[in-house]
Amino acid sequence: MHHTAERPRPLAGVLGVVAQVRGRGKTMPDFAIERQCQGLVCGIDEAGRGPLAGPVVAAAVILDSRRFPKMLRGELDDSKVLTREQREACYRALRRCADRGVARIGVGAASTVEIDRLNILRAALLAMARAVAVLGVRPDIALVDGAIAPPLACAVRTVVKGDALSFSIAAASVVAKVTRDRIMRGLAPRYPGYGWETNVGYATQEHGEAIRRLGITRHHRRSFAPMRLADVGDLPLFAALAAGPL
């Protein structure tokens, strides 16, 4: 049977759930959004849209809410508000959940070549689709962090700031972030001087100075504005851009 991908739209009822959550001062994610859905629910998020170097990585996570560990309920959150140590601890716990059948985890990525060819948004959506493809099961509905989602062979709903609201999306954000950071730290010894062991490819002053001094590697995103400026030799402007947040 041919399945037509449903056009992504905000999840019905999500705004009401969010209002209730905020109204009672709740700041941690939970399963409230998942409970509004029918069937097998998958959370999707990505990491690495902003860096100057490295892939964009996405994760798709399905959680069994009935067996989800109490420890993780108190610790799991949007990866951006967790420390590196907290992210790593949550990642290990999620992997243990997967080993016990409490979670299913799929990870996908798009390379720098694909980022330069497609643009970063399309590459991120491609990584999301790849993550879902390796889950091993097709979800009935995918909850995607943000306002834009890839076409999938299941119902798709976007949830703005979903990584702070939904356990499934928060789990995906942690898996994607930790996976990408590990990739960049693994590349760091092969490309000394760029500081990837700490900046993981993001635009920092150290990274910008290294690019001016050492040049661009095959892992840098040549389509990004600072890379184009470096190519044409506009180093003062490049340094200003690379030193600030992207």
Residue ranges: model-predicted function:
Residues 2-246:
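RNase H-like, Mg2+-dependent phosphodiesterase core
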